[in-house]
């Protein structure tokens, strides 16, 4: 946890997020290790898309202030996402050793979180950069809504966590109509 606090401060000073995957692009498929309700899981994007749209939200690190808010707000909104037929998955490269605990405490067991590999960070262009352009090793705060067809329906990058939930829910509900 000692390492988390200086890096959390750095996340707010980091360069703004720039997502290269645009609306209509094919979402890269991936399989990642993670946790749900405190238990280890394997998340497979291709399998999740067979059930419906996926809200894929990247966040800097488990147990940091903004990420706690984002996870708790997504957890509170899960009934609305489920009603729209969507699966929510949080993915991070920060504090991945704490995902089991984070999934139980901050996600309230409502959705899975997974560890971002270097390949996932690269394919989704979510490597959080320092002001000098070097990597922090964490992921930036970017949310993708992926339609059942595997195409990006929405992309939103901003450090303010609450807007990710409202924007992604609106995008998922638009897919339903």
Residue map of PLM features:
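A short beta-strand-turn-helix
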Residues: 32-53
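Residue-level recognition of short loop/turn positions
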Residues: 36-37, 117, 149
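Short pre-active-site segment immediately N-terminal to redox-active cysteine/selenocysteine motifs
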Residues: 54, 59-63, 95
